[in-house]
Each structure stands twice: as C-alpha cells, then as structure tokens.
C-alpha cells in the first residue's frame, strides 16, 4: 500500500507517490487545475491504479505557525477528497518546501520554463519524504 502526496499550488497540483514499503518518495505527475470534478475523477483513478492507502496534503501554515486563507483551502480540499474516497488524510507542514524544491531543480540544471512546471511535483516529493521519514522514526526495531 502506497502513500500519495499532494502539493496544491495556485495553478498546478504536484503529486508524489511512495514505494510499497513506504520508504522512498518519487515524483509522479503535475496536474493543471481545471475544476473540482476533473480533479476528483483523476484522483480516484490514480488511487486505484497505485493502490493508495493514505493521502498526505501539504499544509501551508504561515512562518509564525498560523493558519491563513491557503490553509482553509487545503482543509476544504481534504474534505472534498473525503467525500469520494475513504482513505486517511494527513497534513504535513509545507513551510519552505517550494524554496527547497526550487533549489533542487536549480541544482539539477533544469531550465527555467521547466522548473515552473516541475516545482509543485518536487515540493510533493519533499512533503511525502518528510512524512515517510516521520513514520520510520516511530517504528521500533
């Protein structure tokens, strides 16, 4: 069973998926946001295709740790997802993930126009890896 991460941007949604053992995150796709119905239908198909058992959403709290309009939007997205799929949804603090994603893409020598599109996918990878790492810290050997 895999974990799916979603980085909800202004125009694009970045997606990342874990391996079946929930150790490694990898970028999956970038979707342009058209409308809610399109998003929900594509999400249901993706969940089935990858055997997803849990969803992680980047949670955009302010630098001081306060909620804002973006956090309300993500909470709404989570509630919308819950109406169509019966999976646990977790929030992960996404502060600085966009900056880190841009740095990774710059270091990878990705062209500027491609970076703009790939930024959300890379941010989703970072969010998911943070979550997976937190799971491994909870596991006792």
UniProtKB/Swiss-Prot annotation:
| Biological process per Gene Ontology, one example term | rRNA 5'-end processing
Gene3D superfamilies, per database record: YqgF/RNase H-like domain (3.30.420.140)
What's the EC number here? 3.1.-.-
| Gene Ontology molecular-function annotations | nuclease activity
A Pfam family assignment: RuvX
Entry GO CC:
cytoplasm
Please give the chief subcellular localization of this protein.
cytoplasm
CDD domains recorded for this chain?
Answer: YqgF
Supply the alphabetized keyword list.
Answer: Cytoplasm, Hydrolase, Nuclease, Ribosome biogenesis
Query: Nuclease as a keyword?
Result: yes
Q: Where in the cell is it found?
A: Cytoplasm
Keyword Ribosomal protein on this protein? no
Q: What does this protein do?
A: Could be a nuclease involved in processing of the 5'-end of pre-16S rRNA.
Extract the NCBIfam families matched here.
RNAse_H_YqgF (TIGR00250)
Sequence similarity:
Belongs to the YqgF nuclease family.
PANTHER family reported in the protein's UniProt record = POLYNUCLEOTIDYL TRANSFERASE, RIBONUCLEASE H-LIKE SUPERFAMILY PROTEIN
User: What HAMAP family does the annotation carry?
Assistant: Nuclease_YqgF
**Official protein name in the record:** Putative pre-16S rRNA nuclease
């Amino acid at each position: 069973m895999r974990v799916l991460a979603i980085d909800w941007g202004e125009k694009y949604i970045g997606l990342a998926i874990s391996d079946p053992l929930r150790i490694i995150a990898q970028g999956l796709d970038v979707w342009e946001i058209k409308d809610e119905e399109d998003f929900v239908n594509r999400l249901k198909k993706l969940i089935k295709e990858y055997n997803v058992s849990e969803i992680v959403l980047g949670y955009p709290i302010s630098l001081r740790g306060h909620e804002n309009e973006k956090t309300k939007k993500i909470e709404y997205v989570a509630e919308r997802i819950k109406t169509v799929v019966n999976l646990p949804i977790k929030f992960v603090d996404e502060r600085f993930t966009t900056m880190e994603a841009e740095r990774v893409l710059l270091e990878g020598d990705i062209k500027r126009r491609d970076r703009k599109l790939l930024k959300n996918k890379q941010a989703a990878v970072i969010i998911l890896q943070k979550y997976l790492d937190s799971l491994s810290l909870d596991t006792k050997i």
